[in-house]
Amino acid sequence: LTAEDPVEYEMEGIGQVQVKEGIGYTFEEALRSFLRQDPEVILVGEIRDKATVDIALKAALTGHLVFSTLHTNDAPSSITRLLNMGTPNYLISAALTLIMAQRLARKTCLDCRVIDENITPKLLNSIGFLPEQSARAKIYKGSGCENCSGSGYKGRMGIYEILEIDNELKAGVLSNLQQTELNAIAKKNGFRTMQDMGQDLLLSGDLSFAEYERVLQSN
């Protein structure tokens, strides 16, 4: 079952419900009605208030797979956002299993890309490249051609980060660790940020430095 605002794509085999806050049918009310039907999977289009998140997390603790969205800058800050909404840390620790954050970036046109001579090792170091990486890196940009209508970009691609809430992170949430401490635990256990993926795409020539800055260095 899904609760959406609005229902943008109709999918066969899925019960989709349109949220209508004007008549009092909110995400919270939709969730309550879903639980009476005991579905295996629930999608809540967006978590906007404490009541909705509490029901969603409790649903996750009673054998339902629950998906939803939340407005934050990255995956780790979703935990802080839930805490700031007044959600008890024990509920977050027990119910949350995975967080994914994503941005959409324009892909450099492969038909007209050239090396961007303005990108210096010092500039690459400033965004987290290691000196030995910066020294040999070749960063590309689109020069514009008929295949990309002169824009230098052709197509789009996702830039992602996926944070698995493992036992160490669950313990950190229960211990009321600060977000910086939770970030450190995640990185130690192999978490790669959107910036890390963006740097990989810079090195592969799929992402221009200008697009990296636009998508990943502005909130």
Residue ranges and their predicted role:
Residues 1-219:
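Short, flexible helix-loop junctions that flank or precede catalytic/ligand sites
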